[in-house]
C-alpha cells in the first residue's frame, strides 16, 4: 500500500508543481491523495509524512524535469488545459447614450514600432468597440511633429503589420499629416471667434507674463489682426519659432501648461522635411489640437488612453467648448510596467544606434516584433492586457505572468522534440541489433498525433551530461542500465510499467550518426545566451516559425536552419 500511496503522491505533487511554477504544496497534494484514496485517511499521519518527502523530492527537480516526468508517467494529468483566470472589462460609461455604437481609436505616433505597452491601448480600444459593443475601431497615425518626433517612413507599414498580428484590425484609417487643411479650417474658425490668437512673444517673455499673473498682451488684439498674422505664418513670413497660435483658456489656471496652450507652430520643413509631405507645410498642429479636432470629426465617442494624458484631456476640452462640440468620454488608465523587459522607445532607439541591440526585433526587447520572434502569441498579450484592465493605478506585471498566459495556449500546440544541450556525452548502446528504431510520442496529451520513428544503425547516442542514475529510460526507445560511468547503456526492456515501478528518470537523447547540430538563442537580461546541442533528425524538417517544445529545456520557435529562439520554460 505504501508504494501505491507514494506513486499517487508523486503524481499529484508533479501535477501541482507543473501547474504552479515548479513548487508543489504539501496541503494541496495531501487533499488530492485523500480524495483519490479515501482509505488512506486511516493512516493520515503517516501519509502526510510520506507526502512531505515526495513534495521535497519533486520541488528539488527543475520545472523541465517535472513536466517531462509527468508527461511520461501520467500524460493524462496534462491533458486538461491549464486554467489561467482572465478578468474581463467593465462596461463603458455613456455607451447607452450612443445606442452601443461606440467608436474608439488607436492613435500611434509612427516614430517607432509598437511595443507591449502600446499594445495595451490598441487592445482595450478594439475590445470595447468590436467585442463588447457593435461599434467602430479607428487607426489614426499622429504624425504632425516632423522635427522632435520625426516619423519613420517604414513605421506606418510596420505598425499596420503589428496590429494585424495582434488581432486588432481597424475599420477606418487616417493619417494626420494628410488632414492639414481640416486643421487649418478649424484654426481659422477659432481665430475669427476670438478663441485663438497668434502670439509673437518669446518663451522668456511668456514666462514673465505668467509669473506676474498677467495675460499675454497678444490675446487682446482683434481677430482681424490675428488673421493677418495667421496668413503670415502660412505664407512663411514668420521663421521657425517666431510665432505660434494659442488657444484661449484660463490665464489663472492652476496648471501653467493649460494656460493658453500652443495649437500651431512654425517648423522649417526644408531642414526637417516630413517623410510623407516633404516641405509642403510649415505650420503644424500640436498633438492636442489635431487630436481634439479628429476625435470630433471622426465621431469618436470614447477615448481610452494612459493617465499621462489627463492634462491633455483638460486642454482639448477648450477646443470642444469654443467650437460648441460635445467631448468624447475620456477614460485614463495607469501605466503598465512589465518587469524584466525593455519597453522604452527612446532606450530601444539609443540602444540600436549604439549597437547594444541588433534591431527592432532583438529578442531582449519588448517590441511586438521581438515578442513575436520569441514565440509569444497574440492571445497571451490579450490575456495580459485584459487581466490588467483599465484601472487608474500603475500595474507592475512580471514577465512570468505573460509566460503563464502564453504557456496556456502554446502547450497544446507545441509538439515535443528531443534536444541534448552541450556539454553532452556519448554513450554506446548494448543489447539492441542494428538498425535500431525508436518511436517517440509527438505530444503526450494528444495521442492521436501519433509517434515519430527514429532509425539509426550506429549504436551511439548523445545524452545530457547530468545523467547519474543507475538505470534510465530513453524516450521512445526503452529502459537501460547505465554502466561504465555513463559511457555505455545496456538494454533491459521497453516496458513502461517497469520504468514506472522503478521510477526511472526519463532522458532525451539524439543518435550520433544523424543528429542535427543546433543552437538555441535565449534572452537573459541584457545578454543573449547561446545553448548549443544535438537534436533528433526530424528537427531538420521543421519550417521557420514552427513552435515546439524541447523536452527538459522549454518552448522554442524555429528561426531558421539549426537556429531556435527560446520562448520560456
UniProtKB/Swiss-Prot annotation:
GO annotations of cellular component type: cytosol
CDD domains in the cross-refs: GluRS_non_core (cd09287)
Name of the protein in its database record: Glutamate--tRNA ligase
Catalyzed chemical reaction(s): tRNA(Glu) + L-glutamate + ATP = L-glutamyl-tRNA(Glu) + AMP + diphosphate
Function: Catalyzes the attachment of glutamate to tRNA(Glu) in a two-step reaction: glutamate is first activated by ATP to form Glu-AMP and then transferred to the acceptor end of tRNA(Glu).
Pfam families recorded: tRNA-synt_1c, tRNA-synt_1c_C, tRNA-synt_1c_C2
NCBIfam families per record: gltX_arch, PRK04156.1
Main subcellular localisation: cytoplasm
Keyword Isomerase: no
Chain ranges for the short sequence motif 'HIGH' region as given in the UniProt record: 108-118
Highest rank taxon of the organism: Archaea
E.C. designation(s): 6.1.1.17
Amino acid at each position: 500500500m505504501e508504494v501505491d500511496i507514494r506513486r499517487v503522491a508523486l503524481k499529484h505533487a508533479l501535477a501541482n508543481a507543473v501547474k504552479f511554477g515548479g513548487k508543489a504544496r504539501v496541503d494541496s497534494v495531501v487533499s488530492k491523495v485523500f480524495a483519490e484514496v479515501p482509505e488512506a485517511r486511516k493512516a493520515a499521519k503517516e501519509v502526510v509524512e510520506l507526502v512531505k518527502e515526495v513534495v521535497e523530492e519533486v520541488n528539488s527537480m527543475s520545472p523541465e524535469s517535472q513536466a517531462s516526468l509527468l508527461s511520461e508517467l501520467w500524460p493524462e494529468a496534462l491533458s486538461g488545459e491549464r486554467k489561467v483566470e482572465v478578468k474581463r472589462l467593465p462596461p463603458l460609461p455613456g455607451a447607452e447614450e450612443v445606442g452601443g455604437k461606440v467608436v474608439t481609436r488607436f492613435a500611434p505616433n509612427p516614430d517607432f514600432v509598437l511595443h507591449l505597452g502600446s499594445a495595451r491601448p490598441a487592445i482595450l480600444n478594439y475590445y470595447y468597440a468590436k467585442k463588447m459593443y457593435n461599434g467602430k475601431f479607428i487607426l489614426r497615425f499622429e504624425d504632425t511633429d516632423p522635427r522632435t518626433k520625426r516619423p519613420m517612413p517604414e513605421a506606418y507599414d510596420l505598425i499596420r503589420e503589428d496590429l494585424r498580428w495582434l488581432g486588432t484590425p481597424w475599420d477606418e484609417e487616417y493619417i494626420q499629416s494628410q488632414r492639414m487643411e481640416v486643421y487649418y479650417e478649424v484654426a481659422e474658425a477659432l481665430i475669427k471667434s476670438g478663441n485663438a490668437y497668434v502670439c509673437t512673444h518669446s518663451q522668456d517673455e511668456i514666462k514673465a507674463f505668467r509669473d506676474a499673473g498677467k495675460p499675454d498682451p497678444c490675446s487682446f488684439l482683434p481677430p482681424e489682426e490675428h488673421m493677418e498674422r495667421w496668413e503670415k505664418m502660412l505664407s512663411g513670413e514668420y521663421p521657425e519659432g517666431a510665432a505660434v497660435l494659442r488657444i484661449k483658456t484660463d490665464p489663472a489656471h492652476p496648471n501653467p501648461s493649460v494656460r493658453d496652450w500652443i495649437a500651431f507652430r512654425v517648423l522649417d520643413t526644408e531642414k526637417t522635411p516630413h517623410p510623407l509631405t516633404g516641405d509642403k507645410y510649415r505650420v503644424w498642429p500640436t498633438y492636442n489640437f489635431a487630436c481634439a479636432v479628429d476625435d470630433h470629426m471622426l465621431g469618436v465617442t470614447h477615448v481610452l488612453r494612459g493617465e499621462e494624458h489627463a492634462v491633455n484631456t483638460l486642454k482639448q476640452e477648450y477646443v470642444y467648448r469654443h467650437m460648441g462640440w460635445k467631448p468624447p468620454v475620456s477614460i485614463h488608465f495607469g501605466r503598465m510596467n512589465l518587469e524584466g523587459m525593455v519597453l522604452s522607445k527612446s532606450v530601444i532607439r539609443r540602444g540600436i544606434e549604439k549597437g547594444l541591440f541588433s534591431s527592432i526585433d532583438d529578442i531582449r526587447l519588448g517590441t511586438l516584433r521581438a515578442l513575436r520572434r520569441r514565440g509569444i502569441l497574440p492571445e497571451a498579450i490579450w490575456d495580459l492586457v485584459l487581466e490588467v484592465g483599465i484601472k487608474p493605478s500603475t500595474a507592475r506585471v512580471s514577465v512570468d505572468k505573460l509566460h503563464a498566459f502564453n504557456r496556456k495556449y502554446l502547450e497544446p500546440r507545441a509538439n515535443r522534440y528531443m534536444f541534448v544541450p552541450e556539454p553532452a556525452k556519448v554513450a554506446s548502446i548494448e543489447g539492441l541489433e542494428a538498425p535500431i528504431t525508436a518511436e517517440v510520442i509527438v505530444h503526450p496529451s494528444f495521442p492521436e498525433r501519433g509517434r515519430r520513428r527514429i532509425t539509426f544503425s550506429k549504436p551511439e547516442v548523445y545524452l545530457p551530461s547530468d545523467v547519474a542514475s543507475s538505470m534510465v529510460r530513453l524516450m521512445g526507445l526503452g529502459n537501460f542500465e547505465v554502466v561504465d560511468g555513463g559511457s555505455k547503456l545496456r538494454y533491459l526492456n521497453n516496458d513502461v510499467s517497469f520504468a514506472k515501478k522503478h521510477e526511472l528518470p526519463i532522458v532525451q537523447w539524439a543518435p550520433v550518426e544523424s543528429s542535427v547540430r543546433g543552437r538555441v538563442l535565449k534572452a537573459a537580461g541584457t545578454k543573449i545566451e547561446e545553448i548549443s546541442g544535438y537534436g533528433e533528425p526530424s528537427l531538420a524538417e521543421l519550417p521557420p516559425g514552427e513552435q515546439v517544445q524541447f523536452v527538459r529545456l522549454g518552448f522554442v520557435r524555429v528561426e531558421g536552419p539549426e537556429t531556435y529562439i527560446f520562448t520560456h520554460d
